[in-house]
């Protein structure tokens, strides 16, 4: 087997206003400004994550893509959020030259999803509905966020993408080009 060039690339994903609104109801804390994701360079496996439904993913104005396996419009696998060099989950903040780990969102132990995994959690509700800001675990800021499931942000992005796909069904074929 020769080492061929990988079809998977890294990209920084901008969290748009619509995505931020969507994520803020599903995770504790403020969603980061940017996250790093893996995506497929092969066009037919690309899926955009922006909430707009009036375009195909290759023409997505945001250019934000998540790794998908299978048909063009079916999101099967979540994007993998991680820092390749340090093998840690990282997110760049909007402040120039700084970065912060996504552990503040409770994602510090996130593992790469296994291909073919059938574990589909539809929604990841906030586990602590009561504001448990001051835990017994040292009183660190955001320590209660570590109680969240590790893939909340990924699931939210994946669900957002699939919602966009479901909303666009039946709207695309208005005659004309084939």
UniProtKB/Swiss-Prot annotation:
InterPro entries: Pns11/12. One of its GO terms (molecular function) is RNA binding. Its main location: host cell. Transmembrane segments: none annotated. It is found in: Host cytoplasm. Residues 113-178 are annotated as: Disordered. The keyword Ion transport does not apply. Keywords: Host cytoplasm, RNA-binding. GO terms for cellular component: host cell cytoplasm. Residues 168-178 have a biased composition (Basic residues). Constituent of viral factories. Binds to ssRNA and dsRNA. Belongs to the phytoreovirus RNA-binding protein family. This is RNA-binding protein.
